[in-house]
């Protein structure tokens, strides 16, 4: 496992809970919801077949943990983090878990800043 980016101050216990914890749910379970995120980690790992994948795991202010390997959601979230870092601004805490349909009618997850 290789950590790409994470919330400042994340402890080893936090990293374990977000990347290996049994209570981490699928981000798709939060589709349509606004999540108030207090911790995140973006990391590279391998799937069960040994193929590389990038995973985003988050923890909300009420302790719920979600993870996804959705390329669109991860790209959206990473772009938000990069833009706010470049502007030396604090990262927003509220994010909308949205969805869309591809041309081949497959559903995918999206991430946006909640107002």
Regions from the language model: what does each represent?
Residues 1-63, 104, 113-115:
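OB-fold ssDNA-binding interfaces and closely related basic DNA-contact patches used
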Residues 87, 95-115:
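Short, charged beta-turn/beta-strand-edge "cap" motif at the junction between a beta-strand
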Residues 64-69:
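A short macromolecule-binding patch
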Residues 30, 75-96:
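Short nucleic-acid-contacting surface segments enriched for D/E, G, S/T with interspersed K/R
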Residues 72:
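Compact, Lys/Arg-rich rRNA/RNP-binding cores from ribosome-related proteins
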